[in-house]
């Protein structure tokens, strides 16, 4: 359970701090739950408690922070009743809004609940002065600092960072050296960068600048980008605009209702002030309905704060004045520092009407707000603007205002798959009879809920309110209220309809639910770039988020995109705007969250102007499947990136797609067709692996059949890239019954695709060798007794792969592979296989003049089908007596010749051969060479006789005909 603080007095809600072993239901909801106490079925959407004996040996599903101020640590509860297996979580939170000397007062600390993150306890309590041991064997201290605590990394600095702000502890720098112009780190004079949050050499800074040159260049470039020029639409727009942002400010306060903190009492008073003035500003919203949001605050201590009420009234009055002002007035935006919110931002919402671009106000650092976090943990302002007053509202053109609001509000958010921004690419599953589908996710944040509250028919309820049934679905949950992430594969039109008509679909969900699960408490829903907020069954907000602005988080690539199972892999995430105070990286696999960490702790050096890099190490499970990497930016980023876990050879081939993502991310190519197809392939292969895992577990989960067209497109994608291992995996899945093939057999489906013909046309000798040697595993169902692929397999027009290879230029390797098949079918049918026109592969080779093909095949025929053979007779018994002659029992050696069958001949030629038995002498004269020699000799003799003179030969004695001797040559 979590540790919490009530006022200035702190008490731990475990061990002796409670006094009672059983907590009431509200306390359990209030202080969170442990992910290791529950086993989540990602397909059935059912959470089952883990037995205590089993849970005590489990490691945390979410990896702890790599920094010394790790955000979570599980501790065991050792109380008088001996319940030592009950796990608690104690984490440290710093409140930047209070001075350091107020952190520990009267023996008590500042304890709070972090919704959606790891709860934190800082201060004294029961056992607070002792070290506790978590399941990973690491030690944490609940109260106070220790001599071995985090220290400043500057040489010679002895500042203890235990009691300072979380920002300084995370980056291991004291407040003095964070603002100093020079500091010695690693025997080098450096300076702390305010944007990179790390030390750089002095030459990387411009004079008088607190941030390095590289970060400033990227920041200035983003500021110079053109922003949409829009205009104010009138009083109705003014009211709607103010209502939206005030309501979002209210939402930010509600995200932190569960924390019993004196700081949040001001937030309660602020809610009351906002509600009192909201009706006067926005007539379309009834304050009585909004007052229902205060029901969650009833457990907080009653109190009044006149200053806070004045602040709330000032906020509303300023909003009215600015919204009703001239066209160049500022966009009203509630500042979290004055609101006392969990963090200092409010969700930016795309307005219905355009707004006006205005000059930039004095820049103040903006703190993103997270529904999962009570505090972002960063400083309130940049050091360069410490003297600047905190404005109650910020303009949309401010560089520090969330630039989601810079998007032209007249443009609807693009519908994407995963992280792709292009909608022009055709899906792998969009051809040949299957509707165009996309894989995307829906996020439900269920406040004040625990896994035991989830209804057993949760899956049916979610599927019931969708316009069409998804072909594939999986999910996972994680703490911080209950964050339920559902990945679906839906038709593109269904995604668009769900996103555009969120209100009507949520009403349908509320009306179709039999219980009060959806109709009670706070519910946040996000579909693509559309957000909705419900409270006690009433829809309070339904707005789109502007997603194409410069600060919107987006993952461009994850490397490796495929990794072997049962290994520990170092992942590298590339993207835009990945690092912020409230952003967190999450890695999930098959319904489990296997890694989560704040992005500040895993950020790497920036090698590109706009691209940021995150590195993390994660142990992978021992099964094949598909995982997701997400970066949650304040709870309002919907981007994700898939990765594959499989065998090493499969991963090596799939990782070739990394070049596509890398080129598209660095070059920012306009045509994202290749990138979208690669993403779609990863998702489709992931769904197939997920289906295989379900069948291997023999779970009776209702599954829609995997369409044959989807399977065919996966095979085409792998064949085009000559991926033998992936092709083998797909063929194995086909023979295990994962694909809906109707009444056909797997052999018929495979052979009808003519894969060997396609490999020959691609001149892929590697793929040809694999296909010729592929044979389904005999342990599988419906296996073939012989090899599936044969060189003489007939395709269209009775063409065989041998015909195609013989007629193709520069295909010697392919023909060599075809004639080296395991059954020697290729060389046997080289002269016998005939196409529809009656020609053999040898005929095609002769016609094309491919003499090299003829010679190569002829040598193989002579080698493997030669005429000579040796027969060795081995007697059944050996006789010791040797006599002359050959006896039946003796060993005999016979060298014989195979007699080929007589070639067919015509009757006329046979009669002519009988009439002229000396055919050898007769046919010898007709040889071309002999005719030439005889012709020359006849000419020489005739010339000599005609001249009647003796020819003169100067190199030898005089030649005379009468001296010429006769005889055989």
Curated annotation (Swiss-Prot):
**What are the record keywords, sorted?**
DNA-binding, Metal-binding, Nucleus, Transcription, Transcription regulation, Zinc, Zinc-finger
What residues bind Zn(2+) 2, as annotated?
Answer: 193, 196, 200, 212
Domain of life, per UniProt, equals Eukaryota
Localization annotation: Nucleus
Regions of compositional bias (Polar residues) in chain numbering? 393-419
Q: What is its main location?
A: nucleus
Chain sites annotated for binding Zn(2+) 1 = 152, 157, 174, 177
User: Which InterPro entries does this entry report, sorted A to Z?
Assistant: Ankyrin_rpt-contain_sf, SBP-like, SBP_dom, SBP_sf
Kindly state the tissue distribution recorded for this protein: Ubiquitous.
Q: Where are the zinc fingers (SBP-type)?
A: 149-226
Q: Where is this region: Disordered?
A: 1-25, 54-81, 377-434
Intervals of motif Bipartite nuclear localization signal: 209-225
Q: Name one GO molecular function term.
A: zinc ion binding
Identify one Gene Ontology CC term for this UniProt entry.
Answer: nucleus
Q: What domain comment accompanies this record?
A: The SBP-type zinc finger is required for the binding to DNA.
Protein role: Trans-acting factor that binds specifically to the consensus nucleotide sequence 5'-TNCGTACAA-3'.
UniProt protein name: Squamosa promoter-binding-like protein 6
Recorded source organism is: Oryza sativa subsp. japonica
Task: Identify the gene encoding this protein.
Answer: SPL6
């Amino acid at each position: 359970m979590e540790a919490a603080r009530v006022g200035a007095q702190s008490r731990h809600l475990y061990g002796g701090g409670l006094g009672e072993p059983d907590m009431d239901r509200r306390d359990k909801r209030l202080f969170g739950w442990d992910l290791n106490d529950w086993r989540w079925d990602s397909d059935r959407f059912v959470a089952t408690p883990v037995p205590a004996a089993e849970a005590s040996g489990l490691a945390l599903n979410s990896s702890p922070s790599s920094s010394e101020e790790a955000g979570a640590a599980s501790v065991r509860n050792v109380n008088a009743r001996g319940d030592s297996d009950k796990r608690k979580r104690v984490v440290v939170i710093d409140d930047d809004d209070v001075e350091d000397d107020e952190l520990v007062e009267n023996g008590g600390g500042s304890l709070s609940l972090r919704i959606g993150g790891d709860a934190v306890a800082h201060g004294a309590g029961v056992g607070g002065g002792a070290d506790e041991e978590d399941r990973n064997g690491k030690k944490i201290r609940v109260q106070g600092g220790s001599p071995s605590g985090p220290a400043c990394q500057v040489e010679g600095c002895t500042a203890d960072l235990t009691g300072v702000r979380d920002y300084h502890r995370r980056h291991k720098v004291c407040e003095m050296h964070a603002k100093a112009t020079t500091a010695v780190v690693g025997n080098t004079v450096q300076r702390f960068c305010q944007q990179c949050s790390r030390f750089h050499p002095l030459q990387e800074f411009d004079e008088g600048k607190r941030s390095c040159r590289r970060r400033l260049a990227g920041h200035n470039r983003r500021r110079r980008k053109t922003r949409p020029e829009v205009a104010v639409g009138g009083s109705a727009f003014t009211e709607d605009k103010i209502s939206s942002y005030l309501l979002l400010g209210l939402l930010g306060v509600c995200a932190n209702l569960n924390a019993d903190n004196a700081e949040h009492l001001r937030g309660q008073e602020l809610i009351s002030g906002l509600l009192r003035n909201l009706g006067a500003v926005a007539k379309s919203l009834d304050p009585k309905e909004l007052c229902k949001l205060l029901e969650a605050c009833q457990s907080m201590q009653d109190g009044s704060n006149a200053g806070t009420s004045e602040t709330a009234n000032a906020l509303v009055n300023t909003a009215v004045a600015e919204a009703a002002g001239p066209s160049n007035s500022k966009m009203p935006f509630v500042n979290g520092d004055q609101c006392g919110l969990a963090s200092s931002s409010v969700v930016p919402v795309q307005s219905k009407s355009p707004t006006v671009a205005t000059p930039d106000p004095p820049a103040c650092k903006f703190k993103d707000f997270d529904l999962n976090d009570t505090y972002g943990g960063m400083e309130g302002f940049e050091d360069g603007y410490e003297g600047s007053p905190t404005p109650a509202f910020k303009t949309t053109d401010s560089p520090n205002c969330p630039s989601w609001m810079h998007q032209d509000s007249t443009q609807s958010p693009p519908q994407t798959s995963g992280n792709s921004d292009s909608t022009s690419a055709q899906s792998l599953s969009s051809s040949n009879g299957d509707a165009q589908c996309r894989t995307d996710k829906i996020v439900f944040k269920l406040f004040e809920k625990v896994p035991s509250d989830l209804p057993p028919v949760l899956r049916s309820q979610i599927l019931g309110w969708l316009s069409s049934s998804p072909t594939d679905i999986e999910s996972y949950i994680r703490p911080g209220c209950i964050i339920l992430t559902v990945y679906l594969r839906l038709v593109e039109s269904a995604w668009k309809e769900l996103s555009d008509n969120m209100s009507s679909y949520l009403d349908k969900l509320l009306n179709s639910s039999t219980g009060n699960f959806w109709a009670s408490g706070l519910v946040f829903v996000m579909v693509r770039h559309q957000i909705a907020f419900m409270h006690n069954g009433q829809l309070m907000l339904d707005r789109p988020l502007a997603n194409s602005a410069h600060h919107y988080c987006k993952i461009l690539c994850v490397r490796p995109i495929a990794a072997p199972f049962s290994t520990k892999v170092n992942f590298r995430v590339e993207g835009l705007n990945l690092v912020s105070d409230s952003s967190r990286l999450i890695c999930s696999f098959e319904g489990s969250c296997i890694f989560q960490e704040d992005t500040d702790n895993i950020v790497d050096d920036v090698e590109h102007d706009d691209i940021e890099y995150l590195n993390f190490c994660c142990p992978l499970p021992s099964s094949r499947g598909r995982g997701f990497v997400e970066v949650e930016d304040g709870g309002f980023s919907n981007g994700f990136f898939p990765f594959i876990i499989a065998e090493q050879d499969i991963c090596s081939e799939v990782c070739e797609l990394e070049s596509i993502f890398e080129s598209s991310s660095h070059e920012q190519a306009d045509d994202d067709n290749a990138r979208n197809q690669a993403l779609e392939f990863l998702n489709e292969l992931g769904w197939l692996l997920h289906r295989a895992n379900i069948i291997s577990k023999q779970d009776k989960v209702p599954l829609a059949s995997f369409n044959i067209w989807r399977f065919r497109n996966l095979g085409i994608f792998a064949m085009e890239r000559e991926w033998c291992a992936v092709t083998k995996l797909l063929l194995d899945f086909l023979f295990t019954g994962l694909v809906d093939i109707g009444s056909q057999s797997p052999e018929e489906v495979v052979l009808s695709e003519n894969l060997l013909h396609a490999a020959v046309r691609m001149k892929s000798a590697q793929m040809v060798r694999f296909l010729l040697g592929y044979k389904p595993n005999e342990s599988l169902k419906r296996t073939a007794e012989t090899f599936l692929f044969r060189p003489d397999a007939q395709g269209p027009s009775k063409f065989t792969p041998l015909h195609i290879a013989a007629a193709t230029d520069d295909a010697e390797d392919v023909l060599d592979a075809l004639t080296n098949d395991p059954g020697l079918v290729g060389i046997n049918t080289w002269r016998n296989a005939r196409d529809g026109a009656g020609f053999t592969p040898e005929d095609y080779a002769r016609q094309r003049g491919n003499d090299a093909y003829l010679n190569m095949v002829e040598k193989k025929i002579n080698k493997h089908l030669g005429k000579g053979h040796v027969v060795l007779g081995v007697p059944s018994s050996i006789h010791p007596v040797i006599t002359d002659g050959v006896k039946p029992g003796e060993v005999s050696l016979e060298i014989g010749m195979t007699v080929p069958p007589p070639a067919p001949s015509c009757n006329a030629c046979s009669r002519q051969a009988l009439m002229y038995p000396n055919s050898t002498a007769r046919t010898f004269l007709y040889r071309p060479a002999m005719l030439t020699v005889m012709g020359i000799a006849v000419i020489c003799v005739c010339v000599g006789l005609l001249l009647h003179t003796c020819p003169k030969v100067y190199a030898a004695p005089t030649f005379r005909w009468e001296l010429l001797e006769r005889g055989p040559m």
